[in-house]
Amino acid sequence: RSSDLYVVKREINFHIPFGEQAITYSPKSFAGSRHVIRARLALPEEIAARRNLAFNCYDEHGDTGFYPHASANVETRGEAVFAARNAIDGIFENSAHGEYPYQSWGINRDPGAALTLDFGREVLLDELRITERADFPHDNYWVKATVEFSDGSTLDIPLVKSAKPQRVTFEPKRVRSLVLKDLIQAEGTSPFPALTQIEAFGTEVK
């Protein structure tokens, strides 16, 4: 798989996951004895294209030196299958939860949970898409979320019970980061809403 990355350091590292950290990747990802990793500079037309600026299947915890990067103030039990990075890995399978391909961002039942998406530079956003985990009846779902942008503006997003991406568009905003917060879950018996993917569509600042 490939992602468009914004690199701010002269050197970047991707740490090969082992054990519990590996179960959010395909079991075939690091199998066998031959592997290839390849990187190249993006073409001008690729840089100029409107795209999902949140997608990064190589994201990890900590200061990676490349963007986009997802982090959160809470992740369920600190487990890899519920880490913030799962919400930008480009995998939309959401009819179950746990190991690949059903990883998600889990909020550990915390009403104050918030996810930060850092683009590493200013970008021009005009659309967000939220895909909630939909492992019903195990899961609950959110009926409202708030996004706070780095320019100080906020956006309330109404949500419904759905396995599909839920889309909201707005006038282009020049931002470096955003925070998904104030997650209001539906009334019900399940205390387990979760996020499968957040997408942020837009372009580079010209």
Positions of predicted regions on the chain:
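Disordered, acidic Ser/Thr/Pro-rich linker "stalks" and the adjacent N-terminal cap
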Residues: N13-A114, D118, P137-N140
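Aromatic, loop-rich ligand-recognition surfaces of beta-strand-rich domains
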Residues: R1-D4, F92-L155, L159, K164, ...
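Long, low-complexity intrinsically disordered regions enriched in Ser/Thr, Asp/Glu, Pro/Gly
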Residues: R1-F18
